[in-house]
């Protein structure tokens, strides 16, 4: 009888050891599979440095990454107004890789002495320093003379100018500094390479941009017939008016 008890007791102890060992194997395996993060790397960003996106998302402190999930990182990063979406994955070691897709910034917008950004989808975004906007034209004087006139039409006019100039000559586009919409009227363009404004009318934007390209090339080749010019007028079809200064006219 005692022998049976001892065998039974031994069997119970053996089973307990087997169960305990199996439990340790399972939990240990799960622990070893836990993803440990101590770094987040942001790529494909041009508007802002990676650290600014992380700061906005509240992910600057790497000591708080322990309980993060990839979904949480994606959700936090995508809250930034500059971003369309973010693709997030684990590198298999200790780093979270974040590839961001930024919105297309078409121009800067000056309204009530405040500078904002305009996307190609007509979305207005706040300007977060240190955003680089040197090559963005500034759209100004947007408000319409008519109270019921939607500013969207003025923005689309400015966008047509930007697109037309971009298609005609990238160097001209890079030097486009400002588009003064004049409250819904014809636009006044300011270029960093011209000492005078350019009046740009609505309609035939591509043709006018090509004319502007030819004038720009003359300036680039030091063939400058516009040295004493007050303005260029491209508001009319098949005509270019050159406004001369009064002193130049008096000397003729």
Predicted regions and their residues:
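Terminal hydrophobic membrane-targeting helix
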Residues: 27-131
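Extracytoplasmic/luminal low-complexity segments enriched in Pro/Gly and acidic/polar residues
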Residues: 203-252
């Amino acid at each position: 009888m005692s022998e049976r008890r001892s065998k039974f007791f031994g069997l119970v102890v053996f089973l307990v050891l087997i169960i305990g060992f199996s439990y340790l194997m399972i939990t240990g395996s799960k622990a070893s599979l836990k993803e440990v993060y101590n770094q987040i790397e942001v790529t494909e960003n041009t508007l802002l440095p990676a650290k600014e996106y992380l700061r906005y998302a509240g992910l600057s402190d790497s000591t708080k990454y322990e309980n993060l999930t990839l979904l949480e990182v994606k959700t936090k990063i995508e809250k930034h107004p500059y971003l369309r979406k973010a693709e997030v994955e684990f590198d298999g070691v200790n780093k979270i890789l974040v590839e961001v897709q930024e919105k297309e910034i078409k121009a800067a917008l000056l309204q009530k002495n405040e500078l904002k950004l305009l996307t190609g989808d007509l979305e207005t975004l706040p300007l977060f320093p240190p955003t680089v906007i040197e090559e963005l034209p500034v759209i100004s004087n947007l408000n319409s003379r008519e109270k019921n006139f939607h500013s969207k039409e003025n923005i689309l006019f400015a966008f047509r100018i930007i697109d037309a100039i971009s298609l005609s000559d990238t160097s001209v586009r890079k030097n486009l500094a400002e588009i003064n919409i004049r409250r819904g009227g014809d636009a006044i363009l300011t270029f960093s390479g011209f000492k005078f404004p350019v009046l740009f009318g609505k309609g035939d934007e591509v043709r006018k941009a090509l004319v502007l390209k030819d004038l720009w090339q003359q300036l680039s080749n030091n063939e400058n017939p516009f040295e004493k010019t007050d303005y260029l007028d491209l508001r009319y079809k098949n005509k270019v008016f050159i406004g001369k200064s009064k002193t130049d006219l008096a000397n003729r």
